[in-house]
């Protein structure tokens, strides 16, 4: 994670922990620590045990159904969101929870995205939990492997591994209104029940492939950025990259140094701004470890700097024009060819699509072995890609840097609420929720990174922490008051979303370009139309009057 094997993350609030890699060696994933042997029974106790033995139920075999008693909370997903929720529950004294993870390790998008150059476009000191700071980040913008190490640290430091069930793929969630329980149907396993369910699988979990004819016909190597094949040797190969989004601008500079030729197929150019990345000096790490308040001050400064950026990317303001001028200057400095510069200049307002951060993307496109192709792709043939101008591009490998299928509508699996309601059907034209967390008709269910919780300018983890606190308040209300149902009122949800969409209509996201923020009908179910400070204020209070409840 950091520069030496001996270095490790430290935090004021988290318990001391072995460094992530060492911790992983101490216990296999999903296994509990071995308990000490119980003390021997006295003769009197043995006699008492014999008298009551006939009354006790026989011990169930390991292969039989789990105990009937449901868990308090069931969490779907072991990425940042799911682990963050688990930490909040543990710190609140709620230990009876289980995390269901379809993969064989934690990490979510950072476990899956291991392509060359994978990194975060938010500064490391802001892309981490405020309650578990890492003083040992190696760079101001850390790579994916280092972020994954941080996630493993969270599991170790907060004792989460015993709660995680790996290779547990949820295929459906069903609510039993009579008992007030959610049942998780699992692929090839017995179902699990809980009083509350938390959907924490995140929006960036399912790889998206473009709708192009002939994908199955192509006989060469196919690699998706979210399913990278590290065994494939790119040396001397003729390679194509489809897409010029966030993953592509990181992959292209890495591949260009290895391949014989690189063809970049661009549908729409993006706004690209410089990335102020630098190596963290040792004295800086020492200062953060010795004086944690100094790191908190840096985090606070980064937070407010990014809050200022909201004026540029969310709404059309003088700062928007300034941001566009800075992006154009970045392009002019790095690309001298007039034709290429025109092809790389967007025709939409900055912020309408995701703004990219890179220092080496433009220089990579100028390499002698790189070709930028802006003709639409007609189809994939057996040997390569055919573009709309009739040119056949013969290739050894096609890289799909086409991101994720972000759920703006529907659900990743059936979610059935009260009275036979099915969430996928209700969200078919666009997802809606109350404060991005709760959905009317689906009691005791909490979403993390739910509808309209996306940040356009600040750290996703800032938004996530606000969601964790709000969801925890709901779980506390449910458990502490021994409720069977806790369900947001439909009128409250409708009023909230009416105001939300009215505000979204005035944002750059809704200014006319096509992006993954919007549904095909132009409905924005993804982004929050405001500052992170406004989002946090919205999530700071849990109004009991906004919810219907029913006691057990």
Annotated model-derived regions:
Residues 397, 401-475:
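Glycine/threonine-rich phosphate-binding loop and adjacent beta-strand/alpha-helix elements that clamp
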Residues 18-63, 67:
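Low-complexity, polybasic segments enriched for Lys interleaved with small residues
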Residues 134-153, 165, 242, 314-322, ...:
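Short beta-strand to alpha-helix junction loop
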Residues 64-80, 84-105, 192, 199-336, ...:
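Rossmann-like dinucleotide-binding core of oxidoreductases
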Residues 462-465, 469-552:
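C-terminal active-site-capping segments
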Residues 321-394:
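Alpha/beta-hydrolase fold catalytic core
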Residues 139-205, 379:
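Feature captures the FAD/FMN-dependent oxidoreductase FAD-binding
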Residues 71-164, 266-267, 333-339:
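Beta1-alpha1 glycine-rich phosphate/pyrophosphate-binding loop at the start
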């Amino acid at each position: 994670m950091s520069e030496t094997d001996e270095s490790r993350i430290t935090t004021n609030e988290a318990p001391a922990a072995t460094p992530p890699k060492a911790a992983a060696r101490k216990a296999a994933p999903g296994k509990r620590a071995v308990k000490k042997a119980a003390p021997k029974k006295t003769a009197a106790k043995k006699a008492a045990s014999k008298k009551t033995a006939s009354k006790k139920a026989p011990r169930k075999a390991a292969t039989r159904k789990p105990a009937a008693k449901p868990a308090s909370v069931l969490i779907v997903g072991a990425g940042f969101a799911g682990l963050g929720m688990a930490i909040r529950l543990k710190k609140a004294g709620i230990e009876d929870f289980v995390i269901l993870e379809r993969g064989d390790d934690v990490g979510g998008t950072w476990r899956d995205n291991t392509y060359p150059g994978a990194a975060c476009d938010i500064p490391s000191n802001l892309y981490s939990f405020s309650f578990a700071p890492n003083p040992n980040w190696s760079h101001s913008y850390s790579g994916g492997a280092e972020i994954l190490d941080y996630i493993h640290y969270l599991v170790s430091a907060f004792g989460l591994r015993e709660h995680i069930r790996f290779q547990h793929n949820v295929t459906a969630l069903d609510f039993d209104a009579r008992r007030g329980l959610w049942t998780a149907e699992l692929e090839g396993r017995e179902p699990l029940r809980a009083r509350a369910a938390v959907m924490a699988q995140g929006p960036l979990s399912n790889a998206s492939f473009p709708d192009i004819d002939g994908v199955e016909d192509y006989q060469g190597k196919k690699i998706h950025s979210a399913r990278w094949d590290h065994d494939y040797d790119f040396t001397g190969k003729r390679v194509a990259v489809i897409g010029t989004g966030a993953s592509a601008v990181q992959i292209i500079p890495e591949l260009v140094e290895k391949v014989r030729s690189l063809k970049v197929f661009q549908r729409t150019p993006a706004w690209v701004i410089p990335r102020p990345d630098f190596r963290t000096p040792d004295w800086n790490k020492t200062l953060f470890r010795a004086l944690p308040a100094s790191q908190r001050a840096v985090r606070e400064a980064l937070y407010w700097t990014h809050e200022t950026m909201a004026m540029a990317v969310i709404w059309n303001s003088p700062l928007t024009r300034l941001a566009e001028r800075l992006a154009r200057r970045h392009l002019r400095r790095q690309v001298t060819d007039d034709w290429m510069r025109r092809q790389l200049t967007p025709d939409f307002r900055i912020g309408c699509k995701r703004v990219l951060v890179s220092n080496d993307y433009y220089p990579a496109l100028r390499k002698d072995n790189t070709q930028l192709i802006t003709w639409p792709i007609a189809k994939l043939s057996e040997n390569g890609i055919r573009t709309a101008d009739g040119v056949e591009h013969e290739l050894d490998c096609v890289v799909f840097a086409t991101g994720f299928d972000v759920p703006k509508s529907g659900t990743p699996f059936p979610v059935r609420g009260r009275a036979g309601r099915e969430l996928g059907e209700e969200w078919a034209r666009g997802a809606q929720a109350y404060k991005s967390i709760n959905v009317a008709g689906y009691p005791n269910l909490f979403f993390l990174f739910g509808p309209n919780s996306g940040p356009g300018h600040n750290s996703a983890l800032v938004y996530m922490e606000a969601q964790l606190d709000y969801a925890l308040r709901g779980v506390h209300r449910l458990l502490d008051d021994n409720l069977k149902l806790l369900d947001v009122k439909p009128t409250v949800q409708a009023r909230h979303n009416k105001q939300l969409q009215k505000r979204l209509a005035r944002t750059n996201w809704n200014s006319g370009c096509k992006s993954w923020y919007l549904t095909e009908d132009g409905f924005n179910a993804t982004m929050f139309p405001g500052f992170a400070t406004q989002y946090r204020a919205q999530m700071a209070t849990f109004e009991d009057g906004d919810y219907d409840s029913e006691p057990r």
